């Protein structure tokens, strides 16, 4: 879980940035990305991650980063609270998909963008 170098491709100056990832473990990459976006002139940086493992000093990295907000699902219970972390329940999606499977309906529409 070590970050080498990070480069920005594109323009973020004057924009609100949303970083998307499937999971966050130690928080180093996400914190570094948020800091880079702000250095390049972003107005704000938020992140959305499906699974919040948040091991080691991840909470401190998030708190000390320039992330305005981190939105995660409740697929993994949080170990602590943070004013920067907002949890969204994935239970309604799971319940709807289970019902669709039970009724032999297609679930592909729930997962395709």
Where are these regions (language model features)?
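PRPP-associated nucleotide enzymes
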Residues: 1-113
